[in-house]
Structures are given as structure tokens and as C-alpha cells.
């Protein structure tokens, strides 16, 4: 489920949207992305890869996953640091849903395993970070996503032009904050958009 190497993602560039949040618009045709926020981990001419940050994985607890993956024995569950219990498990997207990706603050970094993205946010997809979290040596902030969202070359640009997405700068609260159910409206308000008045008019930030 968790890989042993650095995630394979498209290499980005200055003209792309790495580190931005995508906000699904009412015109989004794919129902699995309705009212989603997607943090773009990589975006280039080769395509794009992102993590949905506002869809909880129902009935999945982070501490249960640590036991299932043999990171800790079941008997040590009660010994986990409080920070481990606070890690949310999200549905990161429809691609490779059996694989885990940890978005986290930049205070945790492992060479050849951690991908720095932007503004102090990184991506790691190895068991080492789960062991670090379980041992109280992990990042200050983290979420575990199961699966990811992927786009072929030019696909995301086409969806944005078709008014499928708005984009806005990401911040730690929108990624790691407590209110998963309120993140969508929070992101819209960050752009000065009233969620109650949201229309299908084209445009992006």
C-alpha cells in the first residue's frame, strides 16, 4: 500500500499549477470530483497529479491502518502519541486507491523519499513516514490519502478551460485543518466567491 521509494510524478515548471488547490465547479461532469478540493502535487506538460483533501475515507482510522500494515502491533495502539491519532485518512482520488500518500509539513524530510511541493508542504509515500509518526518523530501536520487524482497531458488544462475548476493558492489550514466538511466553502471564500451564489460562469484565479 505504501511504496518504498519516492512517488513517480510529472516534473513541474514555473508556468504550471504545482502547489495550487483546484476547486471543482458546478459544471464538473465527473461526479466523483463534485465539490472536491484537489491539492496539485505536480503539473507539467507530462500531465498532473493531485490529492483530494476534503473527502474523508469512511470507516478508516489511521491507527487501524498502522496495525494492518504491521507498523505497530495491536497491543501498542494505546501507546501511540496523540499526534498519530490526529492524522486524518482521506480518499485521495480514483487512481491507485490501494496506495497511500502522506501530505505533510516540511519539518519531515527524507532524501529520495520526500517530494517537496510548495510553501512548506511535502509528499511522502513510504512506510518510513508512518513509522516516524507512530514513534512521535513525524511531521507536525499530516494527512494520509488513499489514491490520487491523475490527468493525462493537456487534460487538466482542457478541464480548466471548460470551467470545470477554479484554482487558488493553497494554505496549511485548507490541507491539514480540522473542518474537512467546510474546506470547500472556505476555499471559495478565499477567492472572494460566495458559495451560495456560485454559478457556472467561466474563469479562474
Swiss-Prot record:
Organism listed in the record: Xanthobacter autotrophicus (strain ATCC BAA-1158 / Py2)
Pfam families per UniProt: DUF179
Protein name: UPF0301 protein Xaut_2594
PANTHER family, alphabetized: UNCHARACTERIZED PROTEIN YQGE, UPF0301 PROTEIN YQGE
Highest classification ranks of the organism: Bacteria, Pseudomonadati, Pseudomonadota, Alphaproteobacteria, Hyphomicrobiales
InterPro entries: AlgH-like (IPR003774)
Superkingdom of source: Bacteria
Gene Ontology cellular component list: cytosol
Protein family per UniProt: Belongs to the UPF0301 (AlgH) family.
Amino acid at each position: 500500500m505504501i511504496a518504498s521509494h519516492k512517488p513517480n510524478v510529472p516534473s513541474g515548471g514555473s508556468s504550471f499549477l504545482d502547489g495550487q488547490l483546484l476547486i471543482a465547479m458546478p459544471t464538473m461532469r465527473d461526479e466523483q470530483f463534485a465539490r472536491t478540493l484537489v491539492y496539485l502535487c505536480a503539473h507539467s506538460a507530462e500531465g498532473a497529479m493531485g490529492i483530494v483533501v476534503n473527502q474523508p475515507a469512511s470507516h478508516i482510522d489511521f491507527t487501524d491502518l498502522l496495525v494492518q500494515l504491521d507498523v505497530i502491533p495491536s497491543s501498542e495502539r494505546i501507546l501511540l502519541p496523540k499526534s498519530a491519532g490526529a492524522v486524518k485518512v482521506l480518499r485521495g482520488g480514483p487512481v491507485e486507491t490501494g496506495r497511500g500518500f502522506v501530505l505533510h509539513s516540511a519539518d519531515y524530510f527524507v532524501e529520495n523519499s520526500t517530494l517537496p511541493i510548495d510553501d512548506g508542504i511535502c509528499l511522502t509515500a513510504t512506510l518510513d513516514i508512518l513509522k516516524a509518526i507512530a514513534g512521535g518523530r513525524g511531521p507536525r501536520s499530516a494527512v494520509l490519502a488513499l489514491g490520487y487524482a491523475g490527468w493525462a497531458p493537456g487534460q487538466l488544462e482542457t478541464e480548466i478551460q471548460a470551467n470545470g475548476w477554479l484554482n487558488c493558492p493553497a494554505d496549511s489550514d485548507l490541507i491539514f485543518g480540522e473542518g474537512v466538511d467546510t474546506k470547500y466553502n472556505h476555499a471559495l471564500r478565499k477567492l472572494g466567491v460566495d458559495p451560495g451564489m456560485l454559478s457556472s460562469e467561466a474563469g479562474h484565479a
